[in-house]
Amino acid sequence: MILITLEHILTQIYFSFILVITLVFGGTLVYPVNKLSNSVKKGIIFPFFCITLNLIIRWFYSRHLPLSNLYESLMFFSWNFCLIPFFIDIKNPNTQWIGVITAPSALFTHAFATLILPIEMQQSQRLIPALQSHWLIMHVTIIFLGYVTLLCGSLSSIALLAINLEKKLSFFTLYFRKEYSYENKRKAFHPYSFKNFRKSQMIHQIDNLSYYTIVIGFTFLTIGILSGAVWANEAWGSYWSWDPKEIWALITWLIFANYIHIRLNKGWEGNKPALVASLGLFFVWICYFGVNILGIGFHSYGWFL
């Protein structure tokens, strides 16, 4: 009872802090302040500690990795969204955009798990015999890291497309406004103006962030699929059974393999590969969440209504 109470307290603390961090990150988009952004990036350490302790407590009293139902998988998903920025900061320590993407994602998944799912689905359940294996920790952890990192890369690509679209709309709007003189238009569209230079820098940064996160996520997804195949062979005597989750995982893998191919071999950057990565967002969510809603297959957590 004490552990369950502590778990609920940590859940509320985590939600409160991640909500504040999300709002602050949103504010830095409108009013960029580097010192504030850096402080918020460091501030995510505390909610990450809270949700980590939350999962450890649930692991302790349930006697297994907390992934027995949809609620626990969503909480684990939220934990992964808090973990990803630490990976990205190793390669790109000055990247502000990753927090803008991961904080709302962590908030959304946590809010859905705690506020939308019924109470009975939030209770810990016993693992079925096939899942009582050491492979559970490796396979599920790796595959979830793959899902979350790919989602971050896809969301970065959507942000890139949105910024480029806004840039084009601003161009046409300003160009056809009669009250603007030729000199003002020339300054506004000059590629070396401070505003355009800053926006171009941002686009380049987001493009690189998207590529970097997708490469990491693709690696995790590949390892996760391979480890899952080995586990399936041990549990059911077959490496591949065309389970709905397996099919959608393969489709997702092919989508992002195509993205990496056109980036590396064709040298495409900007909108074209971003469109492919944006499409991947749909397939990742179907692979994870859609199969669970259907409530079919070995990997389903069941219908939640």
UniProtKB/Swiss-Prot annotation:
Q: Which residues cross the membrane?
A: 13-33, 42-62, 70-90, 97-117, 135-155, 212-232, 242-262, 276-296
Where is this chain's protein located in or outside the cell?
A: Plastid, Chloroplast thylakoid membrane
User: Can you tell me which residues the record assigns to a coiled coil?
Assistant: none
Major location category of this protein: plastid
The GO molecular function terms of this record are: heme binding
Q: Which GO terms describe its cellular component?
A: chloroplast thylakoid membrane; plasma membrane
Among InterPro entries, the record links this protein to: Cyt_c_assembly, Cyt_c_biogenesis_CcsA, Cyt_c_biogenesis_CcsA/CcmC
Could you list this entry's UniProt keywords, alphabetically sorted.
Chloroplast, Cytochrome c-type biogenesis, Membrane, Plastid, Thylakoid, Transmembrane, Transmembrane helix
Task: Supply the Pfam families for this chain.
Answer: Cytochrom_C_asm
Assembly and interactions?
Answer: May interact with Ccs1.
HAMAP family for this protein? CytC_CcsA (MF_01391)
* Protein name (Swiss-Prot/TrEMBL): Cytochrome c biogenesis protein CcsA
- Organism whose genome encodes this protein: Welwitschia mirabilis (Tree tumbo)
